[in-house]
Amino acid sequence: MRKPQRGYARQDRVKEQIMRELAELVRTGLKDPRAGFITINEVEVTRDYSHATVFYTVLNQDTREITEEVLEHARGHLRSELSKRIKLFKIPELHFKYDESLERGMSLSALIDQVAAEKPVED
């Protein structure tokens, strides 16, 4: 007999919930005006839920370093607020990493456009 398929693995559901809640907390809970406009792109959680790596980007690249400092400083507060919103046995320790995939994608796109512009048009 076949086992019924599960829609989402629990770890995936937890990752998505952490991502949603952190996005809301960062938007409404960070009071530091130095922080730029922060977007939470992805969350990776270890199997035992002890650590979560949060990938983020900022709208203004000039505020990238300051935003990193603000997030590191607010890490404990954000974890505490997460514990009030998410019912888990263990709330993961948060680690913030700037998501460079967007920048890499844009530079690759620019390189492709450059090569396409240099290539002569064939009739």
Curated annotation (Swiss-Prot):
Family per UniProt?
Belongs to the RbfA family.
What is the name attached to this protein's record?
Answer: Ribosome-binding factor A
- Can you cite a GO biological process for this protein? maturation of SSU-rRNA
Bilayer-crossing regions: none
Query: How is this protein organized at the quaternary level?
Result: Monomer. Binds 30S ribosomal subunits, but not 50S ribosomal subunits or 70S ribosomes.
Q: Which domain of life is it from?
A: Bacteria
What function does the entry list?
Answer: One of several proteins that assist in the late maturation steps of the functional core of the 30S ribosomal subunit. Associates with free 30S ribosomal subunits (but not with 30S subunits that are part of 70S ribosomes or polysomes). Required for efficient processing of 16S rRNA. May interact with the 5'-terminal helix region of 16S rRNA.
- Provenance organism: Neisseria gonorrhoeae (strain NCCP11945)
HAMAP family for the chain = RbfA (MF_00003)
One Pfam family name from the record? RBFA
Keywords, A to Z, come to: Cytoplasm, Ribosome biogenesis
